Amino acid sequence: PPLSKLDKVINWELFREPIEKALYVEPKGAGGRPAFDKIMMFKILILQKYYNLSDEQTEFQINDRTSFKQFLNLKIGDKVPDEKTVWHFKEQLANKNVSQQLFNLFTEQLITQGIVAKEGSMIDASFVDVPRQRNSKDDNADIKKGAVPLDFAKKDKNGKMSKLFQKDTDARWMSKSGERHYGYKDHINADSKTKIITKYSVSSAAPHDSTEIENIVDETDNKLHADSAYRSKEIEEFLKELKCESFVHERGYRNNPLTDEQKESNNIKSKTRSRVEHIFGFMTNSMNDAL
């Protein structure tokens, strides 16, 4: 739904207590900059999920779009959280293991309000490109191993690991259809009727789309639409265990091409499944290409 409608049907104050409880720190006395409202920061994360935005793109779009400002109750001239502030808020929630809890609460409200009918689900994945980093050969070797380079962990004169804060050690390279991507993948489960995202997972850009299926599909899904990247014996068995009807596209192989019947079946399935591409298409065309 439009952001204005979403803003009306969601009781945002329900999120304040779990967020403030998770992020509470003992006050260190007067002084310092006032913190941004926690509900506004959470709404920024909802915008990121809705529009597949990186932290950098998020800051730009909030400054650029009137609809975003209205959704966040910001007036022209109000200070907007920068990309590092958005990243830090996300990291805090993730470290306290409350991100998924908050998103589930958000989805429950959409279902309660009748906006999401749960008549079927669509899954897909999309790249979220982030700025490419200039690291030394040794640093990149450590990052590929999943280790933090020693150079990143050095403390500055204030006792802080400022270089580590500025570096992204989780983003990865991936090539697809001749294009190189550096960053992450958003894996989403969206309601087939409204196209509202109800579950999500984030990985680096490197893993195959299907690797996150167990994190975005569960017993609440009764019908699943997906492209052939999600077609495998293991996934079909997984869906059967969940009692979820599979509408995953059939897959052809080099010596075993699709039959005419399978092609026709895929064409019928595409009428619903392609709606998930509309989500990513909208994200890409209306948001990222504006940068």
Positions of the model-derived regions?
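Basic, short loop/linker segments at the boundary and entry of helix-turn-helix/winged-helix-like folds
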Residues: 3-46, 50
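Trp/Phe/Arg-rich N-terminal binding region typifying the photolyase-homology
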Residues: 26-38, 51-91
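Catalytic-loop motifs flanking and including active-site residues across diverse enzymes
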Residues: 40-43, 209, 275, 279
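Short helix-capping/linker segments at secondary-structure and domain boundaries
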Residues: 50-56, 134, 286-291
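Polybasic low-complexity intrinsically disordered regions
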Residues: 56, 60-63, 81-241
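Short small-residue beta-strand/loop micro-motif enriched in glycine and branched aliphatics
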Residues: 69-70, 196-200, 289-291
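Helix-centered, glycine/charged polyanion-binding patches within enzymatic domains
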Residues: 222, 228-291
